[in-house]
Amino acid sequence: MNNIREQIKDKKRIVVKIGSSSLQHAETGDLDYTRLEKLVRELCDISNQGKEVVLVTSGAIAAGKQAVHLKTTEGQTQAESMAIKQACSAIGQARLMMTYQKLFAEYNQVAAQILMTKNTIVDNLNRYNAHNTFTQLLKMGAIPVVNENDTVATYEIEIGDNDTLSAIVAALIDADLLILLSDIDGLYTDDPRQNPNAEFIEQVDELTEEFMHMGKASTGSNVGTGGMNTKMIAAKIATSSDAVSYTHLRAHETSLHL
């Protein structure tokens, strides 16, 4: 993996995605405010360099569950599970955005909320409007904070995970760089949480079928929907546009501009 400072240095428009497991304390599931503050501080610092920044954030459903002290129970119907998920998203998204607004305000930075579904992308008019909204917000110097609109998204219109969403956003706004922050520090030959012999792959120059197959062995965390497979898919979507390059960092340890 190349030094992230070198990757960011010549880039103008950057999309950063952070997952649920990187936003919370593993032991309690509560929001990790120290990590959130560090992320926001670094995004503001990048913005102060004259770069345009978009944050794609997970964590709404998990934050909502934590707020109402909800634990998963057996025997729920699919409709009941969907209703609980959407209700928790409604609660959690408000709490999550309130936290981001407060943190960004500490650095005199304006944040803007954008919630998306698959219809935002597949419908030409919606996609055009979304592109214009992002463009105008970035011209204003705001940092768009993006999440999937889980409150209204059903199976038919959901994007499914924010790794994919971040790649879609990067392509939509013609970003120069997509950075995925997660609880694993890059690509391995197998899931390192399950296989201690999994080997770290420092850099991938071409997303061959072999590399895509490696991602399928990895599942998501206990609090999120993404895994290594979704990150490989995101990389493929992002790099299909010649303008977008891609990197994957461990959010727990890695600064965005070391």
Residue positions per predicted region:
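Conserved small/polar residues in nucleotide/adenosyl-binding loops
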Residues: 247-254
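Nucleotide/pyrophosphate-binding catalytic subdomain
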Residues: 1-239, 248
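Acidic, glycine-rich loop-and-beta core segments that form the ion-binding/anion-interacting portion
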Residues: 242
